[in-house]
Amino acid sequence: MKKVYELDFRGRKLIVETGELAKQATGAVLVRYGDTVVLSTVVVSKNANVLSDFFPLMVLYQEKLYSVGKIPGGFIKREGRPTEAATLAARMIDRPMRPMFPDNFRNEVQIVNTILSVDPDNSPEMTAMFASSLATSISKIPFDGPIAGVKVGRVDGNLIINPTVEQSENSDIDLTVAGSIDAINMVEAGAKEVSEGDMLDALMFGFDAIKELNKFQKEIIDDIGEEKMEYEALEISDDLKVEVEEKCKSDIDSALRIKDKLEKYNKLDEIKENIVLEYEEKYNDLDDEEKKEEITKVKLVLEEIEYEIFRSIVVKEKLRADGREMTEIRPLSADVDLLPRTHGSALFTRGETQSLSVTTLGALGEHQILDGLDLETEKRFMLHYNFPQFSVGETGRYGAPGRREIGHGALGERALAQVIPSEEEFPYTIRVVSEILESNGSSSQASICAGCMSLMAAGVPIKSPVAGIAMGLITYGDEYTILTDIQGMEDHLGDMDFKVAGTRDGICALQMDIKIKGITKEILAEALANAKEARMKVLDVMLNTIKEPRKEVSKYAPKTLTFMVDPEKIKDIIGKGGDTITKIIQDASGVISVNDINAVKVDLEDDGKVIIYHTDKEVIEKTAKMIKDVVRVPEEGVIYKGKVVKVIDSGCFVELWPGCDGLVHISELDVKRVEKVTDIANVGDEMIVKCLGYDKRGRLNLSRKAAIK
């Protein structure tokens, strides 16, 4: 039976419909927020893979172009693989929901958000997050929700929940915060150098709004929520836990105190493998399925022992995995100009994490076109993150970037975008690529540091240097410890990964994921304060390596020349079918194809701005002269030197400069009578002509006879 629920949320209607659509799904809701409409469905598998060591949750965010009145491009005319924005939206929904499922739940869960209608002023991502939580909460799937999320902006010092497009354009904070009715459990933010105090205020402002949304969900759940299903899970006896612990607790404790990453991991693997081998012999009489199940239990107990000992060492003894103090940063080193032919390069190493970053400058016309649910937009700054398997000493898949690589790249891009100069100040498309060469945690933050230095080495006049640091949280009973600059094990066995990037003046980006149900305001405040202190130390190392952006771009990077022409003349510069601009590029560069790597690049803008790019200043000047010649208007009575480009029976056409030619009628070829045009003029001949003006149809008339009198 269809049911409708309604909430007036911050001046806009939030409407929930259930019981009519997708009734064969385990749970389904249709949510309307303004004119944004999202159908969220959740399905749980009938059987659990109890031997799996992870929870198989898949969140999908399906952008339907009909939702914004678009037909997909290309030959197929169907939606294809998810856009980067869709991938990031799916991750944003997954992150606050995942900690709310039971730890031992192993049934596959698939949440599908279908975006049916989009009103740009009402976020489909936040609508989908709300819908995903509610669809799961009212279903039989065990889920300790609900959760919800909001966007927070700040315009003229005033905080705003779910800002409109116009408000977002004028906002100095772009914050997404999610959580339960009790605590925050996910943060994503970009900001224009905002103070820690102001960011904390924005977080708590968002949390107050989240409580309203979760209270609304609770009312719906109380009305129509199903009884939660019983689910299959491995039952591990206390006797087995005690038995395994007696065999290896002291060995694991000793191994966890080894400071070197590979030595520590190898020793832990050796201890676990020996225990597993011992139990495999013990369970030899069991059939294969029973044996596999019992060995899985042993492995889970080993993981639990490692987990508990590690947390006790950190919280009780105040000892970290590599021997550092709680607020101590790993050893830092930095270098620039490693790669001779790139436009800018930098290497940043923090402990056993290392990023090689390369900056490339291109013409504005080389920007990325984003054609998704938003209006088609252009992106002139990009940061791409690559995480090869060799960086952690492993083999594995190589191919298109996965969700994690896309997410880490987006975080680095968001941090550095805050300090990128405007198009008017620096008319380039900028691409930064971070190659992770070694990793032991916080590789996204190393990418920000290396990326910033490579921008400076490339001569990009950034507003301020940016550094990033990852903060961690370890809880043990009622106690907790916050860690600065977490490494891989502290991330894997810890409760929080809180990445903070910024300048000396404030925060530029945040990202927080946690494995527990939520964290308090006090923990957030302490983490932000410690991150600021650490950030200053990292910036010191970076600025000792390169103090400021280079004054000039690399000799291998394109130089630029910008000038204005009459906007009405842009079409003349382009020419019919692009003929004129193509000929200018070919002639000025000395290339056959405009796609040649040595071809000059020309950006023509609707307002009459012309930007020319090339590594050779002479080529730029030659191109500029040819373009200016096109927009020049011949003056009546003035004599010009041109070249014959076409001969016809009634005369010849003479090109005065590229894009400008006129007719010399046969009667104007000479002071004497001319019987045959080719007696005087042939293609390629130079000719002195006088401008006679334009005829009634706007055609240019020239005369050789008048010029030689």
Labelled PLM ranges:
Residues 1-232:
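Long, basic N-terminal domains or extensions that often function
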Residues 1-45, 49, 232-375, 558-572, ...:
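Extended amphipathic alpha-helical scaffolds
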Residues 25-109, 115-117, 122, 188, ...:
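Glycine-rich, flexible beta-strand/loop modules in the N-terminal catalytic cores of phosphate-handling
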Residues 27-29, 122-140, 336-359, 440-460, ...:
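Conserved phosphate/anionic-ligand binding catalytic regions in large, soluble enzymes, centered on
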Residues 113, 185-190, 231-235, 246-256, ...:
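Short, hydrophobic beta-strand segments
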Residues 140-259, 455-551:
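Mobile "lid/hinge" segments at catalytic clefts and subdomain interfaces of large enzymes
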Residues 231-238, 537-563, 617, 621-641:
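Long, charged amphipathic helices and adjacent flexible linkers at domain junctions
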Residues 558, 567-709:
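Single-stranded RNA-binding regions, centering on S1/OB-family and related RNA-binding modules
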